[in-house]
Protein backbone atom coordinates (compact mmCIF):
# COMPACT_ATOMS: atom_id res chain seq x y z
CA UNK A 1 0.00 0.00 0.00
CA UNK A 2 1.24 3.45 -0.90
CA UNK A 3 1.64 5.89 1.99
CA UNK A 4 -0.05 9.26 1.48
CA UNK A 5 0.68 12.30 3.62
CA UNK A 6 -2.26 13.99 5.34
CA UNK A 7 -2.73 17.69 6.11
CA UNK A 8 -5.93 19.62 6.86
CA UNK A 9 -8.17 17.01 5.27
CA UNK A 10 -6.06 16.75 2.09
CA UNK A 11 -3.72 13.99 0.89
CA UNK A 12 -0.34 14.41 -0.77
CA UNK A 13 2.23 12.07 -2.29
CA UNK A 14 5.12 13.90 -0.59
CA UNK A 15 5.78 14.97 3.00
CA UNK A 16 6.33 18.58 1.91
CA UNK A 17 2.67 18.72 0.83
CA UNK A 18 3.50 19.96 -2.67
CA UNK A 19 1.92 17.21 -4.78
CA UNK A 20 -1.78 16.71 -4.01
CA UNK A 21 -3.51 13.40 -4.63
CA UNK A 22 -6.35 13.43 -7.17
CA UNK A 23 -9.85 13.78 -5.72
CA UNK A 24 -10.92 10.39 -7.11
CA UNK A 25 -8.24 8.51 -5.13
CA UNK A 26 -9.92 5.71 -3.09
CA UNK A 27 -8.16 6.95 0.05
CA UNK A 28 -10.58 9.89 0.13
CA UNK A 29 -13.46 7.44 0.45
CA UNK A 30 -11.69 5.97 3.47
CA UNK A 31 -11.36 9.44 5.03
CA UNK A 32 -15.14 9.83 4.83
CA UNK A 33 -15.52 6.87 7.20
CA UNK A 34 -12.82 7.64 9.77
CA UNK A 35 -11.98 10.55 12.04
CA UNK A 36 -8.31 11.41 12.40
CA UNK A 37 -7.63 12.80 15.92
CA UNK A 38 -6.60 16.46 15.74
CA UNK A 39 -3.74 16.00 18.23
CA UNK A 40 -1.87 13.64 15.88
CA UNK A 41 0.99 14.92 13.75
CA UNK A 42 2.94 13.42 10.82
CA UNK A 43 -0.15 11.49 9.77
CA UNK A 44 0.17 8.93 6.98
CA UNK A 45 -2.94 7.46 5.33
CA UNK A 46 -2.62 4.26 3.29
CA UNK A 47 -3.98 4.17 -0.25
CA UNK A 48 -6.75 1.55 -0.44
CA UNK A 49 -10.49 1.18 -0.87
CA UNK A 50 -12.81 1.34 2.13
CA UNK A 51 -13.56 -2.38 1.74
CA UNK A 52 -9.84 -3.16 1.91
CA UNK A 53 -9.35 -0.78 4.85
CA UNK A 54 -11.79 -2.76 7.00
CA UNK A 55 -9.20 -5.52 7.40
CA UNK A 56 -5.98 -3.47 7.24
CA UNK A 57 -3.96 -0.66 8.76
CA UNK A 58 -5.71 2.62 7.84
CA UNK A 59 -3.50 5.43 9.15
CA UNK A 60 -0.60 6.19 11.48
CA UNK A 61 0.22 9.38 13.40
CA UNK A 62 2.48 10.68 16.16
CA UNK A 63 1.10 11.67 19.57
CA UNK A 64 2.34 14.52 21.79
CA UNK A 65 5.22 12.35 23.06
CA UNK A 66 6.35 11.40 19.57
CA UNK A 67 5.03 7.83 19.79
CA UNK A 68 3.56 6.39 16.60
CA UNK A 69 -0.09 5.40 16.98
CA UNK A 70 -1.63 2.84 14.62
CA UNK A 71 -5.31 2.74 13.60
CA UNK A 72 -6.83 -0.36 12.02
CA UNK A 73 -10.09 -1.31 10.32
CA UNK A 74 -13.01 -2.78 12.24
CA UNK A 75 -12.62 -6.31 10.88
CA UNK A 76 -8.90 -6.32 11.63
CA UNK A 77 -9.64 -5.38 15.26
CA UNK A 78 -12.34 -8.06 15.55
CA UNK A 79 -9.95 -10.70 14.19
CA UNK A 80 -7.20 -9.51 16.53
CA UNK A 81 -9.54 -9.68 19.53
CA UNK A 82 -10.65 -13.19 18.59
CA UNK A 83 -7.00 -14.21 18.29
CA UNK A 84 -6.29 -12.94 21.83
CA UNK A 85 -9.17 -15.04 23.14
CA UNK A 86 -7.71 -18.14 21.47
CA UNK A 87 -4.22 -17.38 22.82
CA UNK A 88 -5.55 -16.99 26.36
CA UNK A 89 -7.29 -20.39 26.27
CA UNK A 90 -4.36 -22.10 24.51
CA UNK A 91 -1.78 -20.95 27.07
CA UNK A 92 -4.08 -21.76 29.99
CA UNK A 93 -4.40 -25.31 28.64
CA UNK A 94 -0.60 -25.86 28.58
CA UNK A 95 0.33 -24.17 31.87
CA UNK A 96 0.35 -27.52 33.71
CA UNK A 97 2.82 -28.92 31.17
CA UNK A 98 4.99 -25.82 31.45
CA UNK A 99 5.01 -26.12 35.25
CA UNK A 100 5.94 -29.81 34.98
CA UNK A 101 8.90 -28.85 32.78
CA UNK A 102 9.96 -26.22 35.32
CA UNK A 103 9.61 -28.58 38.29
CA UNK A 104 11.58 -31.33 36.59
CA UNK A 105 14.55 -29.21 35.52
CA UNK A 106 14.82 -26.69 38.34
CA UNK A 107 15.83 -29.48 40.73
CA UNK A 108 19.05 -30.15 38.80
CA UNK A 109 22.30 -29.70 40.68
CA UNK A 110 24.06 -28.22 37.66
CA UNK A 111 23.23 -24.95 35.92
CA UNK A 112 23.09 -26.49 32.44
CA UNK A 113 20.87 -25.17 29.65
CA UNK A 114 17.80 -27.10 30.81
CA UNK A 115 18.20 -25.69 34.31
CA UNK A 116 18.49 -22.20 32.87
CA UNK A 117 15.45 -22.82 30.67
CA UNK A 118 13.49 -23.83 33.78
CA UNK A 119 14.49 -20.63 35.61
CA UNK A 120 13.75 -18.61 32.46
CA UNK A 121 10.27 -20.14 32.14
CA UNK A 122 9.56 -19.69 35.86
CA UNK A 123 10.48 -16.00 35.65
CA UNK A 124 8.45 -15.55 32.47
CA UNK A 125 5.33 -17.17 33.96
CA UNK A 126 5.70 -15.10 37.13
CA UNK A 127 6.48 -11.68 35.70
CA UNK A 128 5.61 -11.99 31.98
CA UNK A 129 8.67 -9.96 30.99
CA UNK A 130 9.33 -9.22 27.31
CA UNK A 131 11.58 -11.80 25.64
CA UNK A 132 14.59 -9.54 25.09
CA UNK A 133 16.14 -10.04 21.66
CA UNK A 134 19.87 -9.46 21.32
CA UNK A 135 19.39 -7.04 18.41
CA UNK A 136 17.32 -4.69 20.60
CA UNK A 137 20.03 -4.69 23.26
CA UNK A 138 22.62 -3.77 20.62
CA UNK A 139 20.47 -1.18 18.84
CA UNK A 140 19.04 0.77 21.78
CA UNK A 141 20.13 -0.98 25.00
CA UNK A 142 16.62 -2.34 25.56
CA UNK A 143 16.77 -5.20 28.08
CA UNK A 144 14.39 -8.16 28.27
CA UNK A 145 14.40 -11.50 30.06
CA UNK A 146 16.99 -13.20 27.84
CA UNK A 147 19.34 -10.20 27.93
CA UNK A 148 19.32 -9.72 31.71
CA UNK A 149 22.83 -9.47 33.14
CA UNK A 150 24.16 -10.15 36.63
CA UNK A 151 24.31 -6.40 37.22
CA UNK A 152 20.51 -6.27 36.98
CA UNK A 153 20.18 -8.59 39.99
CA UNK A 154 20.46 -7.12 43.50
CA UNK A 155 20.72 -9.73 46.26
CA UNK A 156 19.98 -9.27 49.95
CA UNK A 157 19.35 -11.84 52.72
CA UNK A 158 15.57 -11.49 52.49
CA UNK A 159 14.92 -10.72 48.85
CA UNK A 160 16.26 -10.40 45.32
CA UNK A 161 15.42 -7.30 43.28
CA UNK A 162 15.51 -7.42 39.47
CA UNK A 163 15.98 -3.95 37.94
CA UNK A 164 16.35 -3.07 34.26
CA UNK A 165 15.25 -0.63 31.57
CA UNK A 166 13.06 -2.21 28.90
CA UNK A 167 11.19 -1.14 25.77
CA UNK A 168 10.41 2.58 25.42
CA UNK A 169 12.92 3.28 28.23
CA UNK A 170 10.46 2.03 30.86
CA UNK A 171 12.15 1.09 34.16
CA UNK A 172 11.10 -2.29 35.56
CA UNK A 173 11.55 -3.63 39.07
CA UNK A 174 10.53 -7.07 40.31
CA UNK A 175 10.97 -8.31 43.88
CA UNK A 176 11.55 -11.99 44.68
CA UNK A 177 11.10 -12.68 48.40
CA UNK A 178 13.09 -15.38 50.17
CA UNK A 179 9.93 -17.46 50.59
CA UNK A 180 9.35 -17.49 46.82
CA UNK A 181 10.33 -20.64 44.92
CA UNK A 182 12.34 -18.51 42.47
CA UNK A 183 14.65 -17.11 45.16
CA UNK A 184 17.10 -20.03 45.50
CA UNK A 185 17.35 -20.87 41.75
CA UNK A 186 17.94 -17.20 40.92
CA UNK A 187 20.51 -16.92 43.69
CA UNK A 188 22.27 -19.99 42.30
CA UNK A 189 22.34 -18.54 38.79
CA UNK A 190 23.61 -15.06 39.68
CA UNK A 191 27.35 -14.33 39.66
CA UNK A 192 28.16 -11.04 41.40
CA UNK A 193 31.78 -11.23 40.29
CA UNK A 194 30.78 -10.94 36.59
CA UNK A 195 28.30 -8.04 36.39
CA UNK A 196 28.40 -7.83 32.58
CA UNK A 197 27.83 -11.56 32.10
CA UNK A 198 24.37 -12.60 30.90
CA UNK A 199 22.26 -14.28 33.57
CA UNK A 200 21.17 -16.94 31.07
CA UNK A 201 24.64 -17.46 29.59
CA UNK A 202 23.86 -20.95 28.26
CA UNK A 203 20.73 -19.95 26.39
CA UNK A 204 20.14 -18.42 22.97
CA UNK A 205 17.06 -17.20 21.16
CA UNK A 206 16.99 -20.47 19.22
CA UNK A 207 17.11 -22.63 22.37
CA UNK A 208 14.27 -20.70 23.98
CA UNK A 209 12.16 -20.90 20.80
CA UNK A 210 12.75 -24.65 20.59
CA UNK A 211 11.76 -25.06 24.23
CA UNK A 212 8.54 -23.07 23.93
CA UNK A 213 7.64 -24.80 20.65
CA UNK A 214 7.04 -28.10 22.45
CA UNK A 215 4.03 -26.51 24.16
CA UNK A 216 2.46 -25.34 20.90
CA UNK A 217 2.68 -21.64 21.77
CA UNK A 218 4.96 -18.66 21.10
CA UNK A 219 6.96 -16.79 23.73
CA UNK A 220 4.89 -13.63 23.09
CA UNK A 221 1.73 -15.65 23.80
CA UNK A 222 2.88 -16.00 27.40
CA UNK A 223 2.94 -12.22 27.76
CA UNK A 224 -0.56 -11.87 26.25
CA UNK A 225 -1.79 -14.56 28.64
CA UNK A 226 0.10 -12.93 31.50
CA UNK A 227 -1.51 -9.52 31.06
CA UNK A 228 -4.97 -11.11 31.12
CA UNK A 229 -4.08 -13.42 34.02
CA UNK A 230 -2.73 -10.48 36.02
CA UNK A 231 -5.86 -8.46 35.24
CA UNK A 232 -8.09 -11.31 36.42
CA UNK A 233 -6.10 -11.81 39.62
CA UNK A 234 -6.22 -8.09 40.40
CA UNK A 235 -9.92 -7.95 39.57
CA UNK A 236 -10.69 -10.93 41.82
CA UNK A 237 -8.60 -9.41 44.63
CA UNK A 238 -10.34 -6.05 44.28
CA UNK A 239 -13.80 -7.62 44.44
CA UNK A 240 -12.76 -9.43 47.61
CA UNK A 241 -11.08 -6.48 49.33
CA UNK A 242 -12.36 -3.11 48.10
CA UNK A 243 -15.25 -1.75 50.16
CA UNK A 244 -17.57 -0.32 49.16
CA UNK A 245 -17.30 -1.77 45.67
CA UNK A 246 -17.27 0.86 42.91
CA UNK A 247 -19.27 0.43 39.71
CA UNK A 248 -18.04 -2.29 37.32
CA UNK A 249 -16.73 0.43 34.99
CA UNK A 250 -14.63 2.05 37.73
CA UNK A 251 -13.52 -1.35 39.03
CA UNK A 252 -12.30 -2.34 35.56
CA UNK A 253 -10.46 0.98 35.13
CA UNK A 254 -8.76 0.52 38.52
CA UNK A 255 -7.78 -3.06 37.68
CA UNK A 256 -6.39 -2.15 34.25
CA UNK A 257 -4.29 0.58 35.90
CA UNK A 258 -2.93 -1.92 38.47
CA UNK A 259 -2.19 -4.45 35.72
CA UNK A 260 -0.38 -1.88 33.58
CA UNK A 261 1.86 -0.97 36.53
CA UNK A 262 2.84 -4.62 36.99
CA UNK A 263 3.67 -5.35 33.34
CA UNK A 264 5.19 -1.95 32.51
CA UNK A 265 2.60 -0.45 30.16
CA UNK A 266 0.31 2.52 30.13
CA UNK A 267 -3.29 1.47 30.94
CA UNK A 268 -4.38 2.29 27.37
CA UNK A 269 -1.71 0.03 25.84
CA UNK A 270 -2.58 -2.84 28.19
CA UNK A 271 -6.22 -2.57 27.20
CA UNK A 272 -5.70 -1.97 23.48
CA UNK A 273 -2.77 -4.26 22.75
CA UNK A 274 -3.13 -7.19 25.16
CA UNK A 275 -6.53 -7.49 26.84
CA UNK A 276 -8.97 -10.14 25.61
CA UNK A 277 -12.19 -8.20 24.97
CA UNK A 278 -14.34 -11.22 25.86
CA UNK A 279 -12.89 -11.03 29.37
CA UNK A 280 -13.57 -7.29 29.60
CA UNK A 281 -17.16 -7.77 28.45
CA UNK A 282 -17.66 -10.60 30.94
CA UNK A 283 -16.53 -8.65 34.01
CA UNK A 284 -18.71 -5.64 33.08
CA UNK A 285 -21.76 -7.60 34.22
CA UNK A 286 -22.72 -6.33 37.68
CA UNK A 287 -24.35 -9.67 38.56
CA UNK A 288 -21.05 -11.40 37.83
CA UNK A 289 -19.48 -9.63 40.83
CA UNK A 290 -21.60 -11.79 43.14
CA UNK A 291 -20.17 -14.90 41.52
CA UNK A 292 -16.61 -13.59 41.89
CA UNK A 293 -17.07 -12.80 45.57
CA UNK A 294 -18.00 -16.42 46.33
CA UNK A 295 -15.18 -18.18 44.46
CA UNK A 296 -11.52 -18.97 44.97
CA UNK A 297 -9.23 -17.50 42.35
CA UNK A 298 -8.72 -20.88 40.65
CA UNK A 299 -12.49 -21.35 40.44
CA UNK A 300 -12.89 -17.82 39.08
CA UNK A 301 -10.15 -18.40 36.48
CA UNK A 302 -11.78 -21.66 35.39
CA UNK A 303 -15.16 -19.92 34.95
CA UNK A 304 -13.56 -17.21 32.82
CA UNK A 305 -11.64 -19.72 30.68
CA UNK A 306 -14.80 -21.76 30.05
CA UNK A 307 -16.65 -18.60 29.01
CA UNK A 308 -13.87 -17.44 26.67
CA UNK A 309 -13.58 -20.94 25.22
CA UNK A 310 -17.32 -21.12 24.51
CA UNK A 311 -17.09 -17.72 22.82
CA UNK A 312 -14.25 -18.84 20.55
CA UNK A 313 -15.99 -22.16 19.77
CA UNK A 314 -19.15 -20.27 18.85
Curated annotation (Swiss-Prot):
<keyword id="KW-0946">Virion</keyword>
<dbReference type="InterPro" id="IPR014711">
    <property type="entry name" value="TopoI_cat_a-hlx-sub_euk"/>
</dbReference>
<dbReference type="InterPro" id="IPR035447">
    <property type="entry name" value="DNA_topo_I_N_sf"/>
</dbReference>
<dbReference type="InterPro" id="IPR013500">
    <property type="entry name" value="TopoI_cat_euk"/>
</dbReference>
<dbReference type="InterPro" id="IPR018521">
    <property type="entry name" value="TopoIB_AS"/>
</dbReference>
<dbReference type="GO" id="GO:0003917">
    <property type="term" value="F:DNA topoisomerase type I (single strand cut, ATP-independent) activity"/>
</dbReference>
<comment type="similarity">
    <text>Belongs to the type IB topoisomerase family.</text>
</comment>
<protein>
    <recommendedName>
        <fullName>DNA topoisomerase I</fullName>
        <ecNumber>5.6.2.1</ecNumber>
    </recommendedName>
</protein>
<keyword id="KW-0413">Isomerase</keyword>
<dbReference type="GO" id="GO:0044423">
    <property type="term" value="C:virion component"/>
</dbReference>
<feature type="domain" description="Topo IB-type catalytic">
    <location>
        <begin position="77"/>
        <end position="314"/>
    </location>
</feature>
<dbReference type="InterPro" id="IPR011010">
    <property type="entry name" value="DNA_brk_join_enz"/>
</dbReference>
<dbReference type="Pfam" id="PF09266">
    <property type="entry name" value="VirDNA-topo-I_N"/>
</dbReference>
<dbReference type="InterPro" id="IPR015346">
    <property type="entry name" value="TopoI_N_vir"/>
</dbReference>
<dbReference type="Pfam" id="PF01028">
    <property type="entry name" value="Topoisom_I"/>
</dbReference>
<comment type="function">
    <text>Releases the supercoiling and torsional tension of DNA introduced during the DNA replication and transcription by transiently cleaving and rejoining one strand of the DNA duplex. Introduces a single-strand break via transesterification at the specific target site 5'-[CT]CCTTp site in duplex DNA. The scissile phosphodiester is attacked by the catalytic tyrosine of the enzyme, resulting in the formation of a DNA-(3'-phosphotyrosyl)-enzyme intermediate and the expulsion of a 5'-OH DNA strand. The free DNA strand then undergoes passage around the unbroken strand thus removing DNA supercoils.</text>
</comment>
<keyword id="KW-0238">DNA-binding</keyword>
<dbReference type="InterPro" id="IPR001631">
    <property type="entry name" value="TopoI"/>
</dbReference>
<dbReference type="GO" id="GO:0006265">
    <property type="term" value="P:DNA topological change"/>
</dbReference>
<dbReference type="GO" id="GO:0003677">
    <property type="term" value="F:DNA binding"/>
</dbReference>
<keyword id="KW-0426">Late protein</keyword>
<keyword id="KW-0799">Topoisomerase</keyword>
<feature type="active site" description="O-(3'-phospho-DNA)-tyrosine intermediate">
    <location>
        <position position="274"/>
    </location>
</feature>
Amino acid sequence: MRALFYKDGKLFTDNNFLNPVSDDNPAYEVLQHVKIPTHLTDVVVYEQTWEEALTRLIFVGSDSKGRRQYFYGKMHIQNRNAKRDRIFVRVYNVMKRINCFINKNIKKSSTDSNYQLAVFMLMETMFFIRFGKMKYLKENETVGLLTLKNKHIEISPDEIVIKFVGKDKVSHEFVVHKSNRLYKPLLKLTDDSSPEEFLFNKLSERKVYECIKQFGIRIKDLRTYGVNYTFLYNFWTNVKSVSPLPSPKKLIALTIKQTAEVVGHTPSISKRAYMATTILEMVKDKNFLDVVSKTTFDEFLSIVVDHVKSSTDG
